[in-house]
């Protein structure tokens, strides 16, 4: 679901001036399609700097809860700098509570904030509004206190679940991708190859759900992520295998597309 802010509290005040209109349009729309169009426009325009691209990507992530297309190419620009990306990510994850997170962000210089922003954009977690504003302001070279009190106190969120920070968005995204497969798996198969591959995928998913039911019914705690990672490894081996190349049309497009998304999800937690 999209986020929307009350009038007069636009995030563009925290961003670099040139991308202000783009940021304003993104935060006021409920359309992922609109955000994707804006991102592509900025990404493909060579005059925009890395700072500006990261800020647009941050807002894209905040509004859509997704990583903008080909953002990894932007994040690669920061490799080889003074910050190790994984170390920055671990430092962030080690903090407990908003105050510790805020202090950690404040301890980073501009380059460090860029690196952290990239890590959050590429992750499957949502970005909270306080973290968003602090990163945007820091990348712009502004002190967060210039803008943070106004934004965190007065932003009006219109979707009731927007602040659910404890929800596992990674599992949500996996479920979404698996649901995308449903029409293909339940449809009529045009070729023997299509029937075979769809049958394999369907069987793996059914086996996973049966295993999950058994684990849930055992009365013991179980790691749902661990079970799900096992499923993704099996599905990726099928959907990225040589047999899929034999398929054609919409079935091929959906299976390959979902396979790539599942691979990225698996890679993000491995």
UniProtKB/Swiss-Prot annotation:
GO molecular function: structural constituent of virion
Cellular compartment(s): Virion
Keywords linked to the UniProt accession: Viral envelope protein, Viral matrix protein, Virion
GO annotation, cellular component aspect: viral envelope
InterPro entries with a match to the protein in the record: Mx/ML_C
Annotated Pfam families: Mx_ML (PF17536)
Highest taxon in the source lineage: Viruses
Predominant subcellular localization, coarse grouping: virion
Keyword Protein biosynthesis listed: no
Keyword Repeat (UniProt): no
Protein name: Matrix protein 1
Taxonomic source organism: Dhori virus (strain Indian/1313/61)
Gene that encodes the chain: M1
């Amino acid at each position: 679901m999209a986020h929307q802010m009350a009038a007069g509290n636009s995030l563009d005040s925290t961003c670099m001036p040139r991308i202000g209109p783009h940021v304003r349009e993104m935060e006021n729309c409920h359309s992922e399609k609109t955000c994707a169009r804006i991102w592509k426009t900025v990404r493909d325009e060579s005059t925009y700097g890395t700072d500006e691209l990261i800020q647009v990507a941050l807002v894209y992530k905040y509004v859509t809860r997704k990583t903008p297309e080909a953002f990894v190419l932007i994040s690669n620009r920061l490799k080889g700098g003074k910050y190790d990306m994984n170390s920055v990510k671990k430092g962030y994850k080690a903090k407990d509570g908003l105050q510790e997170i805020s202090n950690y962000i404040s301890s980073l210089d501009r380059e460090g904030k860029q690196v952290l922003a990239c890590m959050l954009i590429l992750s499957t977690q949502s970005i909270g509004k306080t973290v968003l504003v602090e990163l945007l302001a820091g990348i712009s070279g502004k002190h967060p206190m210039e803008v943070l009190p106004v934004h965190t106190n007065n932003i009006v969120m219109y979707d009731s679940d927007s602040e659910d920070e404890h929800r596992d968005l990674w599992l949500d995204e996996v479920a979404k991708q698996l649901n995308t497969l449903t029409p293909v798996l339940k449809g009529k198969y045009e070729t023997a190859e299509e029937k075979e591959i769809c049958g394999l995928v369907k069987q793996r998913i059914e086996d996973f759900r049966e295993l999950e039911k058994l684990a849930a019914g055992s009365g013991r705690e179980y790691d749902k992520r661990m079970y799900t990672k096992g499923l993704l490894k099996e599905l990726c081996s099928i959907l990225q295998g040589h047999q899929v190349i034999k398929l054609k049309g919409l079935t091929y497009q959906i299976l390959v597309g979902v396979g790539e998304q599942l691979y990225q999800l698996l890679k993000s937690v491995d």
